[in-house]
């Protein structure tokens, strides 16, 4: 059993390798097996024809590093631990594994996917539905902030897959609206984030209600001790798929910084950028909800059309704003880290960090929004004297060099 950590403590990715080495160097080294087979194309993976149609229709051409390694073992029914960040195509990895194994003639819940936020759960639901379009999959997202009665009605009518947040999923199981008898796959997405948000007990409670023989997939950017503990309690001889941090991170995304003497001058720099660049769609990250509102007002007063979203807005408003952004009717979205993980817009070509993130891990969650799945993307970081330390930490953490923004930036977009 991995040592459990103090409640509410946070761990970063740098501890992952050390922790794994320590665990694998002990008598428990039989616990994990590494899975090293790599498939260069989706066609080579032995997937159903109609699943392949969904994958290609969604816009995938070549599998990403995590997909090349991760789809097949999941399809084989193995318990899988994948260390993978946002922007690497991991959602499509486990969605493909789930869709390949469903019995479509049985309209009962056969797969349960848990995610830490409503936005992420809804995003997974969209990907699952899109990839399973030609298979006739029935998917439902059970998340807080929506009608309990509506959830009960849909679950009663029958679905193949439920995606949701731990609180609402546990509620549906407790009310017996979600029947666990046929569930054969259980996926924890962003396990580190769920644990840091205090969902550990609920995840354990849900697991107790599931059938004993069940396939488990754990996806996590980092592996804090609590996540390792979960893998030990829930999993049976899991295969461990690790894509090295520098291999999966920022491939295909050009990163730059702009030196700004004072915090107050960031706004001028930002407006200059928007006046010189032809941008399809972009996301601007700031660190506080208050700053989202402030920056939105400032940009609108200068005739820039922008949308804004943050955690203080109700779910319905956030959904409408995200729909507008996805459809392209709004081209600039200002937001905070909280929602970084739920944004998946294929056309985003530019991410601007108006504020650098407070944790190096979040840098990837943010800039992974541009250059999704091998597309070209650009990230621009606005840096004052106070930000220099964090910029240095980010470069060290991801083993990258972030260069000063060149004069010909327009040619890069």
Swiss-Prot record:
Question: Which Gene3D superfamilies does the annotation name?
Answer: P-loop containing nucleotide triphosphate hydrolases
Motif DEAD box residues? 189-192
Q: Give start and end of each Helicase ATP-binding domain.
A: 71-241
Motif Q motif covers 40-68
Q: Which residues form the Helicase C-terminal domain?
A: 252-413
EC id = 3.6.4.13
User: Which InterPro entries did the record assign?
Assistant: DEAD/DEAH_box_helicase_dom, Helicase_ATP-bd, Helicase_C-like, P-loop_NTPase, RNA-helicase_DEAD-box_CS, RNA_helicase_DEAD_Q_motif
- Keyword terms, alphabetized: ATP-binding, Helicase, Hydrolase, Initiation factor, Nucleotide-binding, Protein biosynthesis, RNA-binding
Leading EC class: hydrolase
On whether Transmembrane is a keyword of this UniProt record, the answer is: no
- Which domain of life, per UniProt? Eukaryota
Entry's family note: Belongs to the DEAD box helicase family. eIF4A subfamily.
* Protein name as annotated: Eukaryotic initiation factor 4A-2
Q: Which organism is it from?
A: Nicotiana plumbaginifolia (Leadwort-leaved tobacco)
